[in-house]
Amino acid sequence: MPDTTPQLRLYNTLTRTKEAFAPIDAKNVRMYVCGPTVYDFAHIGNARPVIVFDVLFRLLRHVYGAQHVTYARNITDVDDKINARAARDYPDLPFNEAIRKVTESTNAQFQADVTALGNLQPTVQPRATEHMDEMRAMIDRLVQRGVAYVAQDHVLFSPSAMNARKGPRYGALARRSLDEMLAGARVDVASYKRDEMDFVLWKPSKKGEPGWPSPAGIETLGRPGWHIECSAMSMAKLLEPFGGGLKCDDPERNQFDIHGGGIDLVFPHHENEIAQSCCALGTERMANIWMHNGFLQVEGQKMSKSLGNFITIRDVLNDGLPQLGEWGDNTVRDRWAGLAARLSMLQTHYREPINWTAQRLAESADELHRWYGLLRDEGFGAPEKLSHASAVAAALCDDLNSWAAITALRQAFKVRDVAALGEGMALMGLLDPYFVTASDVPIFARADVDASAIAARIAERLNFINAKNWAEADRIRDELLQEGVQLKDSKDPATGERITTWDVVG
């Protein structure tokens, strides 16, 4: 770790403490994040973990080197919701072809949407359908070890059998006993279950549904449960390439560094992942650090279709900033809206609940406009190394304190430290070089305008305002407007100080 970078500390849901991050292997830092189920447009709640863990991915690359970090985010392409959508949207197609159409188109849209939000591509994006062999092998191991059993062509995991063994306890992540979890959970009490808390690893496929050869000697075709998919995919991408997996008896090689997702996944999904992986691989921990982002509300209310406030990422990109109007290339406009959405979300610490508002999105767009305006005026070039981002890096090393990082960016803007501003924005995924260099971006249409002269007039006007000489301040504003330059006054969100920006009009 470079001497100038402080110790990275992350809050671990498993221990309920903020811990110093010590990778298992600093040359192979590994992170897994639960990704989308590709059956519909992703909503803004889905965007939050993508942005949060993209910032962490960038930070890990900054600290340990890009070539030493592996980030896996899965794609769930086997699910009842996918089946239902395929039957609804493509009733005339063979079912497997209909499913393929749903998953391919939805995944393509998801990738385009999250790219517009300024996110890097993960190192790998495994799909569930590509890892059936690993799922079957893991299920067979769990049956052999007595923590899973076959019943009516299903394979089920038994938390009580796990807790009867030496080793990690079921419920450690959620910090609840089996009785407490049963009392607070909605569970499927099927006749073939031995206990109510038992959960499905594999189930038979109904006629016409997609199916694969089953594990554990079951003769009918079937498909995996949700939880085993992530255990198998993380094993395939973060353990087996580094010497771990079902053939490895070394517990340390069968762990990776960080597992992330939304707070809603703590139970049952992540609890069940831990149970499966630890029992199959003989380790105390599936991942050393478990991180979870908080819930999202819209304008102070839970987001739901029934309330009419269900907002997709695509809605934000297309319609979230109507003041942008139509651009010659609307994909570029979408990228600008995506950066504004990213900044808006990062103004709340990832573990806190976030309240999504149209006002904050607009304010974030205005702030980005000011930052990019300075970078453009000073001719900032995309950096090869982030040698001036120490203040932002220090903030992010404190459990991804994005608010403190944004405060550092605001300070850099205030003192016109262009290197610190631009490189700090890059570390947070807020820097798109196109918006710094392109001459045809509508919001920066300032051809034949002397930016330094306007800045001097704005400074002169500010002096008049501070002296309460309103008439002279208004005179400068009106003169600039006659010259086709409109001033806009606002306040610095952090300090409350007056900020004046300008645009070419007419």
UniProtKB/Swiss-Prot annotation:
Reaction equation(s) it catalyzes: tRNA(Cys) + L-cysteine + ATP = L-cysteinyl-tRNA(Cys) + AMP + diphosphate
Span(s) of short sequence motif 'HIGH' region: 36-46
InterPro entries for this protein: Cys-tRNA-ligase, Cys-tRNA/MSH_ligase, Rossmann-like_a/b/a_fold, tRNA-synt_1_cat_dom, tRNAsynth_Ia_anticodon-bd
Cited Pfam families: tRNA-synt_1e
Binding site for ATP: 305
Single annotated GO MF: cysteine-tRNA ligase activity
Keywords: Aminoacyl-tRNA synthetase, ATP-binding, Cytoplasm, Ligase, Metal-binding, Nucleotide-binding, Protein biosynthesis, Zinc
Motif 'KMSKS' region in this chain: 302-306
EC number: 6.1.1.16
Cofactor list: Zn(2+)
A cellular component term, taken from the record's GO annotations: cytosol
Binding note for cofactor: Binds 1 zinc ion per subunit.
Positions that bind Zn(2+): 34, 230, 269, 273
Biological process, per Gene Ontology: cysteinyl-tRNA aminoacylation
UniProt-annotated location(s): Cytoplasm
EC category name: ligase
NCBIfam families cross-referenced by the UniProt entry: cysS (TIGR00435)
Family membership noted in the UniProt record: Belongs to the class-I aminoacyl-tRNA synthetase family.
Quaternary structure (record): Monomer.
Alphabetical list of PANTHER family matching this protein: CYSTEINE--TRNA LIGASE, CYTOPLASMIC, CYSTEINYL-TRNA SYNTHETASE
Protein name (Swiss-Prot/TrEMBL): Cysteine--tRNA ligase
Species of provenance: Brucella melitensis biotype 2 (strain ATCC 23457)
